[in-house]
Amino acid sequence: RPPGFSPFRIAPASSL
């Protein structure tokens, strides 16, 4: 996983 990869960045993105 790259240093800029975040699993939370994908989940919240769908919530928004």
Curated annotation (Swiss-Prot):
GO MF annotation list: toxin activity
* Family classification: Belongs to the bradykinin-related peptide family.
- Alphabetic keyword roster: Amphibian defense peptide, G-protein coupled receptor impairing toxin, Secreted, Toxin, Vasoactive, Vasodilator
Chief site of localization: secreted
Describe the task this protein carries out: Induces relaxation of arterial smooth muscle, by targeting bradykinin receptors (BDKRB).
What GO biological process term is on the record, naming one? Answer: defense response
Tissue expression per record? Expressed by the skin glands.
Which named protein is this? Bradykinin RL-16-1
Q: Which organism is it from?
A: Pelophylax ridibundus (Marsh frog)
The answer to whether UniProt assigns keyword Ubl conjugation to this entry is no
Domain of life from the UniProt record: Eukaryota
**Where in or outside the cell is it found?**
Secreted
Secreted recorded as keyword:
yes
Any GO CC annotation of this UniProt entry: extracellular region
